[in-house]
């Protein structure tokens, strides 16, 4: 089967024949130009690489083709992608359903030009910079890897992406939300943006704006405190809330961090109490979130404060705590209903039924649909750029793969997906739910009290 690359190769060979005919065996001088390391190295469909007089034999993993190289998958071999999620420790509730959703999407999507797709052994980002970087180095060392689904946590992505990007790979995250990884939504790249990074999760600038509008306009509260744990996700989201709340006219009385691993939250809560806030927004994880709700009643001045968590706490273990009754939570829309991924034909309802049949329980966190859509986005892009050889092998150009992901446009379980220039591809709708009864531990069953779908103010 001939594809775009086959046609370009024929064109290059034709030009080469003409050059040889014109020059004979003369020793004309040729020059090459080194790429500017800071320049955009994405190959466009109409460009070709400079020809040299050295030919490298092709192997199963030969790097060739565009500026970022390519992967050749031998006939009968599997296409290798990787899952990089938090699958152990306190945040495994987030990464495990993401990885399962990736595996299910691969099964539903099927073969690509006769080749199966595999994630190999799932890698663990540990929800930490150290875990993200170590796993990224493992991925980058394997020249057979085509792309990555992950990470679970923004902090892991910040450390992983320089390695992933330098290796010419693409990574699509289902649950990273830190604005630093993409952009400020006004055309300026985030401080940790790297080429080749994409996500189907929302940008937390939207979530911060949503919570600020809910607290100020719907609840009618004008003072609030914000608590983070110092990582890019929690600090970024708490900061986005602070900025948006103050722009609306509210006052953030305290902006403070806890340390991961802390069990005594009394000192931090006592500091918060000095500002007499009407609400506290704490977009952190367990177990620190557990200790806050369990200890806050004992802090004078905070007995009646309104508590608001975020998607990191929208998990059954946390929702089952009696102290969470009366809380609000912000996070991505979970009202997927019969939304169907057009690339596989699987609806959100069908997926959940299949997930429970496979795992014996519902997904434990909010980003399962984002993981499914992210995986199909990657698989579809691979299918669009893969070139099939006469021997049944596939060649996948990494620069073209990034281009294909960037150009993605399809209906997924989370809604319509399309990527901006910095890799924000997913639905930006944020919902706030109310948790009145700790016997209800399925986040999808919590009543939606506020919906937000765009920046305001």
Question: Where are the model-predicted features located?
Answer:
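Extracellular/periplasmic periplasmic-binding protein-like sensory domains
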Residues: 293-372, 385-386, 442, 446-455
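Bacterial lipoprotein signal-peptidase II cleavage site
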Residues: 23-33
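Segments of small-molecule ligand-sensing domains
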Residues: 355-368, 379-442
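Solvent-exposed, acidic/polar segments of extracytosolic/periplasmic ligand-binding ectodomains
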Residues: 45, 60-68, 79, 325, ...
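Hydrophobic alpha-helical segments within soluble ligand-binding/sensing domains
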Residues: 132, 192, 198-225, 264-266, ...
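Beta-alpha junction/loop-to-helix N-cap segments that form part of ligand/metal-binding clefts
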Residues: 24, 66-68, 93-101, 108-187, ...
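Extracytoplasmic "Venus flytrap"
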Residues: 65-103, 109, 122-130, 152-153, ...
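Extracytoplasmic ligand/sensor domains, especially the bilobed periplasmic-binding protein
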Residues: 145-256, 306-332
